[in-house]
UniProtKB/Swiss-Prot annotation:
Name of the protein in its database record: Four and a half LIM domains protein 2
Subunit structure of this chain's protein: Interacts with ZNF638 and TTN/titin. Interacts with E4F1. Interacts with GRB7. Interacts with SIRT1 and FOXO1. Interacts with CEFIP and calcineurin. Interacts with FOXK1.
Gene (name only): FHL2
Cellular component GO terms, alphabetical: nucleus; Z disc
Domain of life: Eukaryota
PANTHER family: FOUR AND A HALF LIM DOMAINS PROTEIN, FOUR AND A HALF LIM DOMAINS PROTEIN 2
Purpose: May function as a molecular transmitter linking various signaling pathways to transcriptional regulation. Negatively regulates the transcriptional repressor E4F1 and may function in cell growth. Inhibits the transcriptional activity of FOXO1 and its apoptotic function by enhancing the interaction of FOXO1 with SIRT1 and FOXO1 deacetylation. Negatively regulates the calcineurin/NFAT signaling pathway in cardiomyocytes.
Native organism: Bos taurus
Record keyword Protein biosynthesis present: no
Position(s), cross-link Glycyl lysine isopeptide (Lys-Gly) (interchain with G-Cter in SUMO2): 78, 167, 220
SUPFAM superfamilies documented for this protein: Glucocorticoid receptor-like (DNA-binding domain)
ZnF (C4-type) residues: 7-31
Length: 279
């Protein structure tokens, strides 16, 4: 007895007929198409076994139905773009939706790398430094007067030059005597510690921190021998080419403050009138 070879669904014999295998089960063409064939997005008909099924994102088309929604040109084996469930050839998509390059004014095609800045777009090769004309790409850049500059060109053309190291000042900086300095270059002439944000003074146009200035140039107190800075409202007494801090201007014997009082001198000492009676 001959073994049966029937359609898995309708059980009609498949001897001498076309059939399709699915998951190792045979189906007649009619059953296969009714059960498994995709429906064409364009014409709404089934895509039969004798037709090529073109698919994109779970959507299916007959080969003859796979065309641009705008110009109706075939998209088979061609690049295309999707917009609001419509398929468009690259030309139609560019005319309808693509941004225009700020430099060359041509469309920026789908899939093309582009640069965007403040609502404008450029082809990657059109986004160039205004000075050296080289593509900026993903490097840092600085806008100036509606033009874009790579950092080295901007620094050469616009950045202030530090009076100390002669290099560009790109961020921050300090102005002293109407000249620009890097913060790290503006240092005490003596100890080289940074002066930015610190109190300092100058002598012969050279800047010094208060400590170095006092050590080098300040007069010494005749009482404690420490420097008298004279800065920041420091009060001191001066008498016969000698100086004292206010707190140090005291009677040598009784330590009474002599600020605003009469006093006597005994060699290098100063005395209050009472202690001076015995001289």
């Amino acid at each position: 007895m001959t073994e049966r070879f029937d359609c898995h669904h309708c059980e009609d014999s498949l001897f001498g007929r076309k059939y399709v295998l699915r998951e190792e089960q045979p189906y007649c063409v009619a059953c296969f198409e009714a059960l498994f064939a995709s429906t064409c997005e364009e014409c709404g008909k089934l895509i039969g076994c004798d037709c090529k099924d073109l698919s994109y994102k779970d959507r299916h088309w007959h080969e003859a139905c796979f065309h641009c929604s705008r110009c109706r040109g075939s998209l088979v084996d061609k690049p295309f773009a999707a917009k609001e469930d419509q398929l468009l050839c690259t030309d139609c998509y560019s005319q309808e939706y693509s941004s225009r390059c700020q430099e060359c004014k041509k469309s920026i095609m789908p899939g093309t790398r582009k640069m965007e800045y403040k609502g404008s777009s450029w082809h990657e090769t059109c986004f160039i430094c205004h000075r050296c004309q080289q593509p900026i790409g993903t490097k840092s850049f600085i806008p100036k007067d509606s033009e874009n500059f790579c950092v080295p060109c901007y620094e050469r053309q616009y950045a202030l030059q530090c009076v100390q190291c002669k290099k560009p000042i790109t961020t921050g900086g300090v102005t002293y005597r109407e000249q620009p300095w890097h913060r790290e270059c503006f240092v005490c002439t003596a100890c080289k510690k940074p002066l930015s944000g610190q109190r300092f003074t100058s002598r012969d146009e050279f800047a010094y921190c208060l400590g170095c200035f006092c050590d080098l140039y300040a007069k010494k107190c005749a009482g404690c021998a420490n420097p008298i800075s004279g800065l920041g409202g420091t009060k001191y007494i001066s008498f016969e080419e000698r100086q004292w801090h206010n707190d140090c201007f005291n009677c040598k014997k009784c330590s009474l403050s002599l600020v605003g009082r009469g006093f006597l001198t005994e060699r290098d000492d100063i005395l209050c009138p009472d202690c001076g009676k015995d001289i």
